[in-house]
Amino acid sequence: MVMTQYGYKGAVRKFGTEATNAVTKELTQVHNREAFSPQDAGSLSYEPRRRALESIMHVKHKRDDSKKARLCADGRKQRLTMRKDETTSPTVCTDSVFITAAIEAPENRRTAVVDLPGAYLSANMDDEEEVLMVMRGDLAEMMALAAPEVYRKYVAITPEGKKVLYVKLCKALYGCLKSACFSTASYGATYTPKTSS
């Protein structure tokens, strides 16, 4: 079985409480890692609210039948304000991984897979630019439930009656254009490749 990814609402329709539990776990991790700080929607002017990135919650149905949620930012708005060379990261291309694996397998080479849990959430955002993100509807409410003492008072109601929560990103969140750069810089400072003599 291949991993299948769903949007938040589709995952809740298909998996019910399993999806809700996965989302709650992800939001709790994001809160515990201090990935963002809540902002008072009433004090934000039109321009910062307009530039705020939309939040996206994905839920993956993994091969072991577990569900894994991932909170992302929709970084498309950032493309309008950044040059391509500002967002280029020295991370590996997915195609390169598969090509290398296709060569290594028949040659019986040793390989290793390394997973850095919450890798992006370990990297700080750049202080040069304030990045705001907005969480809407159920996601805003679930974030408030994850840590009511922190987020509840910042959940605002729009004129249409929808809940919104504006947050300032403090950590590199998946989906932001510079997140891979920040993550690579964060781990690159502590990682030293082992060389053979």
Per-region residue spans from a language model:
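Long, low-complexity, charge-biased intrinsically disordered regions
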Residues: M1-S197
